[in-house]
From Swiss-Prot:
Gene (name only): fasA
Keyword terms, alphabetized: Disulfide bond, Fimbrium, Signal
Protein's GO biological process: cell adhesion involved in single-species biofilm formation
Family (UniProt): Belongs to the fimbrial protein family.
Protein name as it appears in the record: Fimbrial protein 987P
Main localization, broad class: other
Superkingdom classification of source: Bacteria
Signal peptide feature range: 1-23
Subcellular location: Fimbrium
SS bond partners: 46-85
Species of the source: Escherichia coli
GO CC, any one term: pilus
Pfam families xref list: Fimbrial
Keyword Nucleotide-binding: no
Length: 194
């Protein structure tokens, strides 16, 4: 009986170790990928389309002489698209906050300042009706609906342009040539229901 137990124990141990030695080479034939998932659960009735989470709007080149004449450059259109909107929506509220703006700078986005930056200019934002969007001030837009129900996909159309900080033609030579780089965060604060 003792011999049978020893033989059985030896057989079990041999099979365990042989399985381990056979499994080890398989580990050398595999590779791994680490997967990190991110997301956010919100109480908002719309979400920003992931393709619009980060945008670069190229405002082009503008001469100092054009700013002397008109005080602003041509407007460039862009949009922030929203998805998964609740059908009971009747308006969307948003705020644009400038990353370099202080409390008194509400007419335009203040550009970053460095050795190659233009001076005397800002980046102005307006809606698609050319109405000014003040920095840090909540703005309300109606939703697009069909049959009294808001569409699932909505869009906030906007325009941006480079202009003098006074908003007028640069008659005193306050504008200098250089790069203009401004950044902002647009927050969809809430979406109203009827």
């Amino acid at each position: 009986m003792r011999m049978k137990k020893s033989a059985l124990t030896l057989a079990v141990l041999s099979s365990l170790f042989s399985g381990y030695s056979l499994a080890a080479p398989a580990e050398n034939n595999t590779s791994q990928a680490n997967l990190d998932f991110t997301g956010k659960v919100t109480a908002s009735l719309c979400q920003v389309d992931t393709s619009n989470l980060s945008q670069t709007i190229d405002l082009g080149e503008l001469s100092t002489s054009a700013l002397k004449a008109t005080g602003k450059g041509p407007a460039k259109s862009f949009a922030v698209n929203l998805i998964n909107c609740d059908t009971t929506l009747n308006s969307i509220k948003y705020t644009i906050a400038g990353n370099n703006n202080t409390g008194s700078d509400t007419k335009y986005l203040v550009p970053a300042s460095n050795d190659t930056s233009a001076s005397g200019v800002g980046v102005y934002i307006q809606d698609n009706n050319a109405q000014a969007v003040e920095i840090g001030t909540e703005k309300t837009v109606p939703v697009v609906s069909n049959g009294g129900l808001a569409l699932s996909d909505q869009s906030i159309p906007l325009q941006a342009y480079i202009g003098t900080t006074t908003g007028n033609p640069d008659t005193n030579g306050g504008v200098t040539a250089g790069t203009v780089t401004a950044s902002a965060v647009m927050t969809i604060r809430s979406a109203g229901t009827p």
